[in-house]
Every structure is written in C-alpha cells, then in structure tokens.
C-alpha cells in the first residue's frame, strides 16, 4: 500500500508529529494504537487504516499537488512549453502578498476543463480577490493548500485530544520548499521535509526488518533519519 509504506518512512522525532504524505494528493494524519471512531471523526472525513505492527493510520485525504500539476499542464498546452515547477514557485513568490484563497476540497477542482479558470471562478464565487496572473493563481493555490493543512491539523487535535508539535512531510511534494514554508507559517509548527521516495523506502524497511537488518520500526526510522537529508522550515 503506497500510503502505508510512505507513513512508515516518516523519520518522526516523537509521537507528537503529524505525518503528511505529499504528492498528487495529501494524506495527513498520525499513527495510533487504537482506532478513533466517534461520529465527529466520520463527519470530518478522517479514516482509520490498518498498518504495520497492528497500528492504525488515522488520516484525512486532502487535495495535494493536483491543482499545481493541472495548472502546469494547462500552461504547457497554451504555450507549447510546460513551465518547470521552480518557475511556477518563483511566480507565486513574486505574488506572495496576493490574498486569493479557495476550498481545495471542493469537487469543482477534481477534473475541471480549465483549472486556471476554475480557481478564478471559485475566488469570485467566494468573494475573494480574483487572480489575474499565473503568479496570483499559483499563490492562491499555495494559500489554499496551507490553510487546509492547518484546518486539518486543528481537527486532528480536537479528535485525538493531543497537541502536535511538528509536521513531517514525505513524498515528492516534500521538495516544494515554498509550500513547506507556507505550511509552517499557517500551522505555526516546524516542518521537516523528506525523504522524497517515502513509499519505496517504507516497503524496503519492512523487508529489512523481516530479514533482521533492522531490529524494529524505531531502528529503521532512525536509519532513515541518519541516511537522508531532512530539511527544516521553522514557522515565521
């Protein structure tokens, strides 16, 4: 299971870390020894998934980089050349003061004919500033993702009764340091980003534990922490 493997690869420092598997979709949650099943949990769209060593991944599926990927593809179709992700990030940074925001969980963003037009329409419908440039569209998406991560963590704290002190991001999306920094700022929690190949590493870890190369999951995670560059973004 890709998410299950990715969560295993999180080099968390303690049991107060939120896990975020960041890719086309964002899977945000924690590991628990027991499932959490009150009606409020279902209403907030959190789920319990069985995991390694009879743990439960308690998580929520949130929009991830799909909106950014869609904008990139659309711009490529318009110009004949797809902009790079660093170019899109730079455009957003130039529009960093733009305050557009949408609800990334809205079904309108799942498969629109034009993601750019849909973002603009959603801002207009919500009475928010309407982006006019690529940078403003990108900044709107970044504002929205970081806000929705922050809202999900607040829900998570309410449902678990725990206060979390950091966020560990794994997967391809962990390379987007601008989103990582905005997430740190929105949540007021430090963000630790990496490793990128969480799913492959988690799968390998389980096999190596079984083969006796690692004593247990804690030992394997300690090795991940020492073996890969983990970048930190402190809240501002």
Regions found by a protein language model. Give the residues of each.
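Active-site core segments that coordinate phosphate-bearing ligands/cofactors
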Residues: 1-166, 175-199, 205-235
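Glycine-rich Rossmann-fold phosphate-binding loop(s) that bind the pyrophosphate
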Residues: 172
């Amino acid at each position: 299971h890709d998410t299950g493997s990715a969560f295993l690869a999180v080099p968390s420092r303690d049991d107060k870390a939120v896990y975020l598997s960041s890719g086309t979709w964002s899977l945000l949650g924690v590991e628990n020894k027991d499932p959490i099943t009150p009606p409020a949990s279902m209403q907030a769209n959190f789920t319990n998934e069985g995991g390694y060593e009879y743990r439960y991944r308690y998580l929520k599926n949130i929009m991830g980089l799909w909106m950014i990927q869609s904008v990139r593809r659309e711009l490529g179709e318009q110009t004949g050349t797809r902009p790079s992700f660093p170019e899109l990030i730079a455009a957003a940074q130039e529009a960093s003061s733009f305050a557009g925001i949408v609800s990334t969980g809205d079904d309108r963003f799942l498969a629109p004919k034009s993601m750019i037009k849909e973002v603009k329409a959603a801002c207009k419908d919500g009475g928010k500033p309407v982006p006019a440039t690529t940078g403003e569209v990108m900044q709107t998406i970044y504002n929205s993702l970081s806000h929705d991560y922050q809202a999900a963590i607040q829900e998570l704290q309410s449902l678990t009764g725990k206060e979390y002190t950091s966020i560990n991001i794994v997967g391809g999306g962990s390379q987007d340091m601008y989103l990582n920094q905005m997430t740190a700022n929105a949540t007021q929690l430090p963000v630790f980003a990496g490793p990128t190949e969480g799913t492959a590493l988690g799968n390998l870890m389980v096999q190596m534990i079984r083969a006796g190369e690692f004593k247990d999951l804690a030992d394997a995670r300690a090795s991940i922490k020492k073996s890969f560059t983990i970048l930190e973004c402190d809240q501002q």
